[in-house]
Amino acid sequence: NSKDSEQRGIKIDNVRFSSMKDYACSNDLETGKVSCKKTYKDNSSANTPILFKNMVPIKYENNKWIIADLGQKWYDYDAKEWANAVVLNSGVTKNVGDEVTEEEISLWYVWIPRYKYTIFNGNNGSAAAQLINVTFESGVSRTGTVTCTDNADGSETCSTITNGTSTYTHPAFKFGNTELTGFWVGKFEVSGSTSAITVKPNVTSLRSQTVSSFFTAIQNVKTTYGINNADSHMMKNMEWGAVAYLKQSKYGLGTTDIAVNTNSSYYTGGGQSDAYKTNVAQSTTGNIYGVYDMSGGAWEYVMGNMNNSSNAFYSSNAGFTTAPDAKYYDSYKYDTSYTSHARGKLGDATKETLTTFGNTSGGWYSDYAGFPHSCYSWFARGGFCGNGTVDGVFDFG
């Protein structure tokens, strides 16, 4: 082994690897030694979670969260146990098997693996709430039969669709020009402050900010917490749709409606003192492993923007002076009506998930369904704690 890092390589003899992608390797720059360990992969065919800098995997065992061993079971999508990972508070260090308390966590994430789904209502119609057929894809393979192209006016053009047969690789798994094996989503609504965003249970969510303020604060997470090899960003409308569809599949709650976070003080996870542990009906999986606060709590702005009448970025009162990079938001066609549902896109959990097309009361499970229009150009999702039955993961307004 050379002491010159530019000349150092890896030589492996007499070892049979089924696939190097199933191994996590690290090297010691002082000694030049390389160690590799086989990483755990469940039987669902979901892509293995990618841990970014300062993220540690956790699993729930004996009524507590512990640091997971990457070589042992720590998630199981067939059992509706989605992968969880956290960024710990500064100065907190843990070893495999150590307990992690909610107070020790700064950021909490859930892994959404790449998938395609069978299109069930792709032609601007009405459809009853139903199970969505999701199939995990390997690596960055794009195996869906349907392709869609975004147009300059914010609309999209898709190839021929046959409901119940055509499949579509969910578009949330393409970020700019990069195909993704999956992405991490915050487990709870954001909290803390714009100078130090947190994502954790048992605290009041951060509210009363402009879209641009949220956007900048969430981007700054990567430097605040040292996740420098990730591209932290505010959730896009299409990413919300990807989580919603996974919830509606056999890997989540399925056709069971997600419960509403009715806490009037806007506590994440539905309350204080680890209330999220009993409020599992508010999770996308119906257990502690899913994503919370997607129904009720506070309205959640997402990066879904309606163009202005000249087909340009329309900030309205969001606080942007220039448009963000196009990869950070989904663009929609201008219209003066909030019931012009045909402006929705495949995968975003808008026009496909309507029991009554063209009606604001027509969302699945009676969720509110109102598009951005001439008065306001941004999507908000999930409803808020005081809306009652119109709240839900398919709520948009």
Residue ranges with predicted function:
Residues K21-Y23, N237-G241, T268-G271, Y276-T278, ...:
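C-terminal, surface-exposed recognition/capping segments
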Residues Y115-T118, F188-G192, G304-N307:
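Acidic glycine-/aspartate-rich tracts in secreted/extracellular proteins
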